[in-house]
Amino acid sequence: YTETKGKTDDVMQSSESSTGVTNSITDRKESIRQGVTVLSENLEEAAHHKVDPWTAVQAYNFGKAYIDYVAKNGGVNTVELAKAYSKNVVAPSLGNTSGQTYTYYQPVAMYYGGGKLYTNGGNIYYAKEVQFNLFLMRMFSRL
């Protein structure tokens, strides 16, 4: 849900990790299989590097190299660390060398940082959004 809100067939936006091309997976079950595989690999890598599991979740958005970055910078995913990685690693690798930002109007993002994201820099609030969505699922499952 965090990725696409269920609006595309690649519900977990896992195409890039599989083929390197966005939206190349057109089957929801395949998207989920690929997404679970990537998250599982990230969790194993996070355990190997002795970082928190939320680093693995954030790496689902940024890519596996984020796990090593966190391991070298305190071992715990934070919005501040994700912001630095987005600005200094992800965004420049995809052409944003000027630090250009835009506003991401999403409640969790607005709460944690005014909604600012770096253009081509991934989502620095991704792990927090997943945490919030898990909270909502737990809350509504009790009704």
Model-predicted regions and their roles:
Residues 5-6, 17-33, 37, 41-143:
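Non-catalytic cell-wall polysaccharide-engagement segments
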Residues 12-16:
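Conserved catalytic-core motifs characterized by acidic clusters
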Residues 2-11:
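Conserved alpha-helical segments that form or flank metal/cofactor-binding pockets of metalloenzymes
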